Amino acid sequence: TIDLGFAHTTLPSGEELSFIDVPGHVKFLRNMLAGVGGVTASVFVVAATEGWKPQSEEHLRILELLGIESGVVVLTKSDLVDADLLELAHMDVAEHVNGTFLADAPVVAVSATTGAGLDELRRELDALVARTTRASDRGRPRLWVDRVFAAKGSGTVVTGTLTGGRLTTDQNVVVGDHRARIRSLQTAGRAVDEIGPGTRVAVNLTGVDHHDLARGDALVAPDQWHLTDRFDASVHVLAALDHDLTRRGAFVAYIGSGEHAVRLRVLGTETLAPGTDGAVRLFLPTALPLMPGDRFVLRESGRDETVGGGEVLDIEPVLRASRAAPDRTIERVVRERGWVTVADVE
């Protein structure tokens, strides 16, 4: 896989499950990051013929930075190894996921060629869906666009994972900087008049040309979101880093499905050591509809490495960076501003 792939299936329970297939090769990590921003669980694939790879490690760390809490590990190509090598692959995976959210995840060996293990995998996917927190409806829909194209006879189409609220046909929306109207909606290959959060959806739009939109844009309802070009956030610096995190560097933040060159200021100190937690202020090149609790991954493009990631704490910081000590408490927001908004308590 070079770019994102999309698929869906109906599980034995009748639950409908959507997949975002992300590329594994290091050269396409930016595409991987564009795809994982909207996921709630992971099907973590390791080829039994190859075992754990350096990119497996980076993908696992990225999923942890994004707050993913549940998943299933799948050992593919199991028909190409004997029983001893398959057992070694199991042990290899168990060693690497120890201490992570996948530590207690089921490991299923499968073969796409023979069909071995696929029924077991479908049962485990049902169990995964059952233990994964359902998307909540806050009445504020947001869809980070991961694909834009023009459909013959229909016009502009954007796709993404819907969160936060519902979309309906004929609804007015804002995508990036452009106002538009929803002509039609599709999910899992069928047309619908309304769609709820936690769903992969294709949105056919009128009033905007597909050339004016791009991956990383957000589709939202008008006048529901505060756009911000700076925010304070918690950050965890990866332990594997061989240097401290400072304000110096060519940083890129991956938020939703977007990739944004950012400036960074470490809060409360000058540096953060590998394996530690702290706070940062990030300055974006363009304003985005963010809210506290949104997750991000931080990379340093000069070194071509993942630095860490964290959670948005304050979408409208009022204190100078030298004085800021952000957290998600209402007390802190009221103390600094004297007021609080609905977005601050979500």
Task: Put a short name on every predicted segment.
Residues 30, 34, 44, 54-61, ...:
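Solvent-exposed alpha-helical segments within well-ordered globular domains of core cellular machineries
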Residues 25-26, 49-53, 68, 77-82, ...:
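Conserved nucleotide-binding/hydrolysis micro-motifs of P-loop NTPases
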Residues 16, 22-28, 36-88:
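Conserved Switch II/interswitch segment of TRAFAC-class P-loop GTPases
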